[in-house]
A protein has these predicted regions:
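Catalytic active-site module of serine/aspartate enzymes centered on a nucleophile-bearing elbow/loop
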Residues: 218-267
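Conserved alpha/beta-hydrolase catalytic His-Asp/Glu region
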Residues: 104-109, 123-185
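Short beta-strand/loop motif that positions the catalytic acidic residue
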Residues: 189, 195-197
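Conserved acidic catalytic loop of the alpha/beta-hydrolase fold
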Residues: 49-67
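Flexible "cap/lid" loop of the alpha/beta hydrolase fold
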Residues: 84-85, 90-124
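Conserved alpha/beta-hydrolase "acid-adjacent" motif
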Residues: 202-207
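Gly/Ala-rich beta-loop-alpha elbow adjacent to hydrolase catalytic centers
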Residues: 71-75, 79
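Conserved HGGG/HGGXW glycine-rich cap/lid loop of the alpha/beta-hydrolase fold
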Residues: 1-44
Length: 267
């Protein structure tokens, strides 16, 4: 099950679906606020808790007991917390580009940025907001590497509901807790987790190293010279890493971190 980021929708998983559907049943969906899914006008209908439950409700509706969950950015945040709340429903978690605004030094700036972007969607529409997002620092490498892919990403973003995007930004992105607030829960997590992040995704690098240290069943893959949308920038590398991870999990060989590997941590 693929869970998309704020700046995209189910269409941005196309290169993953083409690859993984050869061996797996693949499910993509648009989050609430992203047509053709419903776009509630009530702000209370948005937020990270709703997004976590939406994954579970989708699975229940499709009569799926458990699945591999793959999320990017906002979708990765929901996927990670899904693993905390619905442990038995997750075979594994692929958590890509998670954690913008999670570090203490980023909290205030991320909150302000999220609300400013929400205002752009409301006052100037999705086309203007899409221009801002697609030209942000974490998207530049996609533009540099794959101009056609970047233009497609921008076009899809321009098509999003300005109301749904604004409310998602205000109620989910701006108000979600820092991942560091869930430290105790992460330390108890036993689900296999692959953390994936680009080394030029500045707002996510540190928090992914932090998560690696908290989640004893996690592995961390850092993709060089890569920004935020790691699955779009480096689809072949991303698919390969995820394929290897899923294969290892299904063979029962994705094990907890060996305690011996941290004995020198205080040197």
């Amino acid at each position: 099950i693929f869970v998309h980021e704020f700046g995209s929708d189910l269409r941005e998983w196309e290169q993953q679906v083409r690859h993984f559907s050869r061996e797996y049943k693949c499910i993509t969906f648009n989050a609430r606020g992203y047509p053709p899914s419903e776009v509630p006008e009530d702000a209370k209908q948005y937020g990270y808790k709703h997004s976590v439950d939406d994954i579970a409700n989708l699975m229940k509706e499709l009569k799926i007991n458990n699945a591999h969950i793959i999320g990017l950015s906002m979708g990765a945040y929901a996927a990670l917390l899904f693993g905390l709340k619905y442990k038995k429903m997750a075979k594994s978690l692929v958590i890509a580009g998670v954690g913008s605004g999670a570090m203490p030094q980023h909290r205030k700036g991320f909150f302000s940025m999220a609300n400013e972007l929400a205002d752009e969607f409301i006052k100037k529409g999705s086309k203007k907001a899409a221009s801002i997002i697609s030209n942000s620092g974490s998207r530049i490498q996609l533009k540099n590497k794959d101009l056609r892919g970047w233009l497609e990403f921008k076009k899809h973003l321009e098509e999003h509901s300005n109301i749904g995007s604004a409310l998602t930004m205000q109620q989910y992105q701006a108000l979600r807790p820092s991942l560091m607030d869930f430290e105790n829960e992460f330390k108890r997590m036993n689900i296999p987790v692959l953390l994936a992040v680009g080394d030029e995704d500045e707002l996510c690098l540190e928090i992914n190293i932090y998560l690696k240290r908290q989640i004893k069943t996690s592995g961390l893959w850092i993709c060089s010279r890569t920004g935020h949308a790691i699955n779009l920038e480096e689809p072949a590398a991303f698919n390969r890493e995820v394929q290897n991870f899923l294969s290892t999990v299904e063979r029962g060989n994705w094990l907890k971190r060996d305690k011996e590997s941290i004995k020198d941590i205080n040197i």
